[in-house]
Amino acid sequence: MAAGRAQVPSSEQAWLEDAQVFIQKTLCPAVKEPNVQLTPLVIDCVKTVWLSQGRNQGSTLPLSYSFVSVQDLKTHQRLPCCSHLSWSSSAYQAWAQEAGPNGNPLPREQLLLLGTLTDLSADLEQECRNGSLYVRDNTGVLSCELIDLDLSWLGHLFLFPRWSYLPPARWNSSGEGHLELWDAPVPVFPLTISPGPVTPIPVLYPESASCLLRLRNKLRGVQRNLAGSLVRLSALVKSKQKAYFILSLGRSHPAVTHVSIIVQVPAQLVWHRALRPGTAYVLTELRVSKIRGQRQHVWMTSQSSRLLLLKPECVQELELELEGPLLEADPKPLPMPSNSEDKKDPESLVRYSRLLSYSGAVTGVLNEPAGLYELDGQLGLCLAYQQFRGLRRVMRPGVCLQLQDVHLLQSVGGGTRRPVLAPCLRGAVLLQSFSRQKPGAHSSRQAYGASLYEQLVWERQLGLPLYLWATKALEELACKLCPHVLRHHQFLQHSSPGSPSLGLQLLAPTLDLLAPPGSPVRNAHNEILEEPHHCPLQKYTRLQTPSSFPTLATLKEEGQRKAWASFDPKALLPLPEASYLPSCQLNRRLAWSWLCLLPSAFCPAQVLLGVLVASSHKGCLQLRDQSGSLPCLLLAKHSQPLSDPRLIGCLVRAERFQLIVERDVRSSFPSWKELSMPGFIQKQQARVYVQFFLADALILPVPRPCLHSATPSTPQTDPTGPEGPHLGQSRLFLLCHKEALMKRNFCVPPGASPEVPKPALSFYVLGSWLGGTQRKEGTGWGLPEPQGNDDNDQKVHLIFFGSSVRWFEFLHPGQVYRLIAPGPATPMLFEKDGSSCISRRPLELAGCASCLTVQDNWTLELESSQDIQDVLDANKSLPESSLTDLLSDNFTDSLVSFSAEILSRTLCEPLVASLWMKLGNTGAMRRCVKLTVALETAECEFPPHLDVYIEDPHLPPSLGLLPGARVHFSQLEKRVSRSHNVYCCFRSSTYVQVLSFPPETTISIPLPHIYLAELLQGGQSPFQATASCHIVSVFSLQLFWVCAYCTSICRQGKCTRLGSTCPTQTAISQAIIRLLVEDGTAEAVVTCRNHHVAAALGLCPREWASLLDFVQVPGRVVLQFAGPGAQLESSARVDEPMTMFLWTLCTSPSVLRPIVLSFELERKPSKIVPLEPPRLQRFQCGELPFLTHVNPRLRLSCLSIRESEYSSSLGILASSC
């Protein structure tokens, strides 16, 4: 080639020498001598393409381009690239701009690629062909995609002028890249054009071919040629036995009659890439065959069959002499794609999809492993119902597709709002052009899980709506758990009998409910051939999203949002009660409230999911995921606490739970009138946690390799493996009592830092050793070492602080635990006192032999072997104090234990205040929590109520202390108030165990209706009840106005306190009336307050408001009815109209009338002063005096007053309202 030129530039000479070396090494057959003719042919081919655009640039050779082999691409090309031999830089820039404003175009590399186009991946047998295309040279094979394939190109050497190469993703180290061939390849050797047939090919057209199938018995062994237009092309189906596809030929497009042909010869599978709907073809040497397991017969290709373009001059229709009835038989027409809207069965919720063809561009990748994409920015595309593994690698924004016989589903639900196109096996997805954009940087969750998603479709047989929800749910789960808890490939791995997929296990409860296992397996032949068409996409039901898996941070934020959205001071303090509260009480009542949210409160319902961890900083259990952690309170079941530490590190899934939001508010509302003004709220914060029963949850162990490979933030607390430490020693102990978790001071050991230590979160445990120390032997524990003394009950005081605080929630009295110390055996490890944190005197008083500090690396296991069952049975019950000990003045043992239901929880002032609280100092009001509880006791029908106070350092209270919850209190301190009421306080020895959560639905139980005499029966009477009685007389009536800030009397709306510095001059009314009532069995003095006074006086709201307005002038009116007449304790005169009105009203039948009274005892059941005995009282009956024993009058507080059914009319005063 060089002989034809006098001089060759050195650069061209060097380029030609490199080209010759490359060609001889890469393209020439290795078994032959170097082919000297191949080099000039390749150079001429390159020059022809280089000069095809009329660009010379001073050289006839592309000197800036270099040859690249398949191996070089696979080894050295790490980034996606493209190469366009005939393009200038400006042409490439124009091409790249078409990638779109947000697209990232493929970078250009100046590379020359040559190779043989083949459908064989290697030098293998013909049967190994699966329809894929490859580019091959001497260095290797690389898979490729081509838009329009000419079957005559196979096996020939080509120059590829325009192509792009996409290397395997970084996460897929074992994968291979692929080529995208944009233009038709340029042959190095001229292609030989096969001459047409000498004689016309006898062919059958679809009508005759369909009729001929009826004569299958006469056509055995006979092969025919079929001709027609391609009207349908199925997907390429690959099963374990073989791969195949089915095409349908018709006379025209759209066709009235069609005939189906199965292509399953391996060498013919590549036809699938060459076929184009609407093009006419001839298929030669077809035979009639029956599909195994099917009734119908079909045409099928043979080994010698060929695919030819239909040329009318080269074919001749074969005339067949068939029987008349067969010719008259009307073959089944091909159903046409419907243009109507989705059909909807009016009698059900079943919808029918539309079947159509569509061409569009991919504008987004929604979930590549799941086969979900976006088309034209407005449609969804789901390829999961086809086997699209080969197509997945080219699918990215910018790819143009032609969809044949694709299903359109609208309003599928399940969180999907856009219409979705989904091809089944009958449809075909054909490439029209490749994307100019680089593949996106896929995250790990977008790269793994293809086999799991296929399992959902092909094994679980999910319909499209449920499949779309499942893919979304798996994405949510991957975001929650990967990669810190699990690796993506482990979470989304294929599920098998020996290795279940964790992702599928989390979805199984929902999937089993909506799509029970056992659905019929898809039959590919029926799905493609059967008429009418049946496939999983044909019918569907709109799916109401069953649930979602929010991150714990999202769940927490949504709970807080709902809690504060529902926070309404007016609802928490409804009128008329709030209008009588002074500012301090008003703000204290608003200071704490709570909200319980069930999963059904969210739309869709939320599923709780996280890894259970034990916090060593707070001593509580937490659920943790990628977004953070959420405190949780778990019970194994009702009245059974969580006690198995092996649950740490497990994945917990719960559909039934309570999301608790405790609201703490610091406010300065002057009065009830300003409750609607949020500006008076100074600070608000919330404590959010969840509580649920372990029996309602799904517990899944997380594989240990996943945890060890996680980052340091992994919630791993157990340093040992699942079989425990290989070396170590342990000892069993029975837990007798657990003290409160609180900050305590510890002694500083000698030689420690001189700095004053800060209080550390800790707790103590009192227990008894069961046997001696045991050493690790294999996977079990050896025999206990003999003890020096014969006392089997060796008490021990265990101290937990630092990291060992994490065991707090698992330790409960009455259980036997194994304390494990890893590492080499150390003599007397569990006997010696390794710390000086506690003095010997308390240990001696408790009868403890030793004090032991639990080290950070020690672990605990719950022991439940048969050897200790007797010990567990003997210590199973919780300690309970008798009701007599609780409600008595006996202080022999001031520590009491009992179970109770919490009735209310409020904030109150501290029990002991060293200094007077400053007015308005709301911070001081927050230092004490009062729980009013109803004791659980079988000694009386109506459980007595008791107040339990929690003060620092036990604040904030532990989780779960909510109204409606059942709780066991152990070792509370019993006290007696100055008014002789028994109450209890938390001490450092107090242990609280939640027995059950508040009920999800509250049922209002009416108060019992009793006679007043029943209240004289002591403990057998209810604390609150209803009685029908009659008001006999009024003892006293007080009406006054006070300052809402300092509660001093207000006259004419002004505070009368000396030196008043009240920030607001808001006055509120107060009212108290004392009545004498009787029901024929006993008498009672009833105290009514505020708005209940209006009901007692029989006044309507308007009259009551007018009366209070009149009282505002003097500020205070007190009427005493102990003697005759009324005494006015105010500046007003006795003969004033208001005084006369009140005196007349209180002695009129409008007040002295029958009523239905709801009340509670003024004397609390916890009061220990004995009841007043009956007294002698003189009665005068005419002239005769009588002496008789009379029971003391009951003292009641009014809860409500209703008019009796037998009450007479209230007269003019009431009727005027």
Swiss-Prot record:
Location of the protein in the cell: Nucleus; Chromosome, Telomere
Keyword tRNA-binding in annotation: no
GO biological process, one term: spleen development
Any one GO MF annotation of this record: single-stranded DNA binding
Major localization class: nucleus
Keyword Zinc carried by entry: no
Gene Ontology CC, one term: CST complex
InterPro entries in the cross-refs: CTC1 (IPR029156), CTC1-like (IPR042617)
Assembly and binders: Component of the CST complex, composed of TEN1/C17orf106, CTC1/C17orf68 and STN1; in the complex interacts directly with STN1. Interacts with ACD and POT1.
PANTHER family hit by this protein: CST COMPLEX SUBUNIT CTC1 (PTHR14865:SF2)
Stated name of the protein: CST complex subunit CTC1
Source organism of the structure: Homo sapiens
Gene that encodes it: CTC1
